[in-house]
Amino acid sequence: MKIKWLGHSCFIIEGNDKIIIDPYITGNPVCPESVESIDVDIIALTHAHGDHFGDTIKIGKEKGAKLVAIYEIVEYASKHGIEGEAINMGGGVRIGNTEITMVPAFHSSGFTSADFKFCGAAPAGLIIKSGKTVYHAGDTSLFSDMKLIGELYKPDVALLPIGGRYTMDARQAAMAAEWINAKITIPMHYNTWDVIKQDANEFKKMAEERGANVVILNPGEEIEI
């Protein structure tokens, strides 16, 4: 499996299938790629905020990728001609040779457009099993059931927000990394803007003091596991 970080919370996972998570590309000040360069089978969304929903419609239309997200987001996307599979907390779906399961996150979620309005607390994390197992925590605070997520799904890789302000910060994320106990932890959702500026090396130090194995990626870099 290859995991490529495109900055913020956007990753491309190349396992049994090719998946993009939270495709915030256009307008992302740290993303090194364009929508035109993206070629994926599946779009997986954690929630509806613009810095996560991003280019979902454009990628779905131009690349024919299937959307996996919570029910309300799939309903919205369907109005724009995007084919999707709706899931909800604790449930999941198999597409191709990839299984995606939705798990809780503690945040908020909502979008408004001219033709559709939705606002509600429906954020999520995602367990993506595509050869290896990846836990994308979405935007979230620290919560104790991260221990259960680690125990139940045994992820090979955990993708954790560390930026603070809107999510847990580096200190909280270090504790999350210990609880989840993935083989590799990769920080995300930081340094996109000054308001979520964090030192990833400080996170790495705190997490590794708790027994985690942290790999820091720069936008555009990938790791193979």
Model-predicted regions and their roles:
Residues 54-112, 117:
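Glycine/small-residue-rich loop that forms an oxyanion/phosphate-binding "nest" at active or ligand-binding sites
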Residues 27-28, 49-54, 74-77, 91-94, ...:
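Active-site environment of divalent metal-dependent phosphoester hydrolases
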Residues 2-5, 19-22, 99-105, 133-139:
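Active-site-proximal beta-strand elements of phosphoester/diester hydrolases
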Residues 21-23, 40-48, 68-71, 135-138, ...:
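Active-site neighborhood of phospho(di)ester-bond hydrolases with catalytic His/Asp-centered motifs
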Residues 112-178:
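Active-site-proximal loop/helix segments of hydrolase catalytic cores
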Residues 1-18, 25-28, 94-97, 202-210, ...:
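Zn-dependent metallo-beta-lactamase
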Residues 12-49, 54-61, 72, 108-119, ...:
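Pre-active-site segment of Zn-dependent metallo-hydrolases
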Residues 66, 78-91, 174, 178-225:
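Binuclear metal-ion centers of metallo-dependent hydrolases, dominated by the metallo-beta-lactamase
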